[in-house]
Amino acid sequence: CWAPYDEATYQAALNFVQPADVVLDIGAGDLRLACRIANIAQQVIAIERQPGLLAGHAPLPPHLTVLCADARAIPWPKGITLAVLLMRHCTHFNAYVTRLRRIGCRRLITNARWGMGAELVNLGCRADWDTVKLGWYACVCGQTGFLPGPPAALTAALMEHIHEVETCPACRGSQQGV
């Protein structure tokens, strides 16, 4: 099931795109965002598995390549600098991140972790879970939440900060087959 996002979400995503980027748009829908990204980025590769969403599209920008396929089932090119995953109900976030890291991509625009807006996720090195003592966290596997701690230690700045982590309890559970 596909549905377009509001203009504020698209604009937030576009603000993260740089002219030198080679972008992989995973689940590109009707290409409305991919076409706009192609006006900014060096190259865009858009993958959408529903052919009906791609049919009858106006002429495409020259820097846009469209693939009708399941992004989980096809190889991705190396050289991707930025990926887009606007899929707020995505259940394969960790699999996508793992593949993006494998091809060298280090930045991801997504709404899959928090289910709203658009954030830029750094796919590079992240803090280990054991270093987080209190506050909001977002893991590379897609899990998010709040780690409670002593109320006296909670500050306004800490409430605004999101700890970007690896190996949260959900990751550890899946690694142990739980």
Residue ranges and their predicted role:
Residues 62-71:
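Conserved SAM-binding strand-loop segment of SAM-dependent methyltransferases
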Residues 20-29:
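Conserved class I S-adenosyl-L-methionine
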Residues 1-18:
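S-adenosyl-L-methionine
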Residues 50-52:
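Conserved SAM/SAH-binding beta-strand->alpha-helix loop
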Residues 57-58:
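Conserved SAM-binding loop
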Residues 90-104:
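A short, conserved alpha-helix within the catalytic core of class I
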Residues 30-40:
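Conserved SAM-binding loop of SAM-dependent methyltransferases across substrates and taxa
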Residues 43-48:
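Conserved SAM-binding motif I beta-strand of class I
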